[in-house]
Amino acid sequence: MIRNSKILMNKLKRIGLGQITSTNNKEDNFRKCKEMIEKAVENKVNLFCLPECFAFISGGIHQFESRDNAEYLDQKGGIIERYKDLAKQNNIWLSLGGFHEKILDDPNDMIYNTHLIIDSNGVIVCEYRKMHLFDVDIPSKGVKMNESKVVKGGNDLVVCDSPVGKLGLSICYDLRFPELYLSLRRMDAQILLVPSAFMKSTGEAHWKPLLQARAIENQTYVIAAAQTGDHHSKRSSYGHSMIIDPWGKVLHDLPDNLNDIAFVDIDLDYISTCRENIPVFNHKKLNNYKI
């Protein structure tokens, strides 16, 4: 099933997203993503977005599994080379959010969690390294995650020009830090990309309101491609990939456990309309806020 929402069809800027259940089987993940990209191409999508961990998600074997399966961005015959070929062959832009990137000569053998934009010529035009890392230890609930043990945080904010507008890049846990998105908006972002793999418990409580808040407060579209379903016996993702407009209206909300695509035709003029109706960025007192 393919879901489509049309907004002011005189403006043909079509963005799509894919919702998948990745595993530690790279070939199977690539096959699923390739099929989704081909569907997107059939439906004339200009930019197609895949979720965090699109290429690989830990099988729960050991805590360094993601690191051991990481690759360099320019690795000969690597997974990113295959996606670059897909983009070029299909004349489509790709947002690949949450790739385990090897760091050359890192003394601690760390990796980056990297969001890539690949253009329709198969060229990487933007790279964002996840800034906010998820470390939590709740003994009473038996929950312990330590992303920073394996992943090195990035420092650079990234806004990327594309045929569909200016893209503000982020990944998953970044969503909880509104200052990041405020900064992206101040860098003229029109569309916020939030590829994610939210856990079910936090997803049910916070996913939708956080996405709507980022859309409303920055008056931007939000495109949030998400992992869904059971990856292995100890890890499940919430799903509910969403596309939200600058007024906060949810245009798409893919059901949990559904591997599918959705797309919309967006009109950048609508962003201007929302910003004119409520010109909050003209009224901000940035010098007065102490953060």
Curated annotation (Swiss-Prot):
The keyword Hydrolase applies. Signal peptide: none annotated. InterPro entries: C-N_Hydrolase (IPR003010), C-N_Hydrolase_sf (IPR036526), Nit1/2_C-N_Hydrolase (IPR045254), UPF0012_CS (IPR001110). Its EC number is 3.5.1.128. One of its GO terms (molecular function) is deaminated glutathione amidase activity. The keyword Ribosomal protein does not apply. Keywords: Hydrolase. It is an enzyme of class 3 (hydrolase). PANTHER family: DEAMINATED GLUTATHIONE AMIDASE (PTHR23088:SF27), NITRILASE-RELATED (PTHR23088). This is Deaminated glutathione amidase. It comes from Dictyostelium discoideum (Social amoeba). The gene is nit1-1.
